[in-house]
Amino acid sequence: MSTISAALVMQLRERTGAGMMECKKFLIATNGDIEQAIIEMRKAGQAKADKKADRVAAEGIIVIARSSDERTAVMLEINSETDFVARDENFTNFANAVADIALTSLPKNIEDLSNQALSSGATVEQARQELVAKIGENIKLRRLEKMHCDGVIGYYLHGSRIGVMVALKNGSEALAKDIAMHVAASKPMVVSRDQVPAEAIENEREIFTAQAKESGKPQEIIDKMIDGRINKFIDEVSLLGQPYVKDPNIKVGQLLKEKNAEVISFVRYEVGEGIEKKEDNFVEEVMAQVRT
């Protein structure tokens, strides 16, 4: 059995809100696998919430550029170390220039994009390095998404921290933008029910099964409870099954059917999702600056 460190116990406690002894017990049972420990704690009703999993720590902006015919678009996440720099005009100008060149060149990946030439003659990478030297913070081109369709692409930016692109068939740009706004707010996993990963469904089924057995109800009732909760879960994570944010009385799928439109695909970015950023002690930070 692997040694369970105090730091790992604290990490699980911070993510779940459970007691220290409970966290240690589940980490021992899962040989230190924190993700499996969270699943087991949910089954046992011990995990209050995975508090830390969705925490966005890194700074930066999302930028989108779209062609004039509304059929091609690109979306980028560009990171900085602080929100202050993310709002800096030099940083935002750089980000928008990179998005424009990405739309023009449609690079294969970030590395390819970094080698593209901007209107100034400098490559994206050279311009990035110059900006780092000027601003004094590390700047990173984190990810790039390209989208093309024969219909129309709508997009929505919530400030500069959340960006969504939606490819729509047989619909208007206004409808595509409304759907993009919905995706920004409701965070669906997939477009339709049949696209929900089998692994995700099975994980939820295991959790629901463990929870339902605690009810003491007959097995046939438990089976119905589990099926009902699985169906609810699938609706919650699929775009077409979600209540439409602008009119919760109808689902997105119903809205699209009324408009004779179809969502081909969507992409949602949120600044820093999945990144952990070191949380500095403010006093120590000031003292460090005084000492330098």
Swiss-Prot record:
Q: Which Gene3D superfamilies match?
A: 1.10.286.20, DNA helicase RuvA subunit, C-terminal domain, Elongation factor Ts, dimerisation domain
Gene Ontology molecular-function annotations: translation elongation factor activity
Q: Where is this region: Involved in Mg(2+) ion dislocation from EF-Tu?
A: 82-85
Entry keywords, A to Z: Cytoplasm, Elongation factor, Protein biosynthesis
Subcellular localization(s) per the UniProt record: Cytoplasm
InterPro entries in the record: EF-Ts_dimer_sf (IPR036402), Transl_elong_EFTs/EF1B (IPR001816), Transl_elong_EFTs/EF1B_dimer (IPR014039), Transl_elong_Ts_CS (IPR018101), UBA-like_sf (IPR009060)
Q: Which GO terms describe its cellular component?
A: cytoplasm
Q: Is Cytoplasm a UniProt keyword of this protein?
A: yes
HAMAP family per UniProt: EF_Ts (MF_00050)
The text of the family note is:
Belongs to the EF-Ts family.
Its function?
Associates with the EF-Tu.GDP complex and induces the exchange of GDP to GTP. It remains bound to the aminoacyl-tRNA.EF-Tu.GTP complex up to the GTP hydrolysis stage on the ribosome.
What's the protein name? Elongation factor Ts
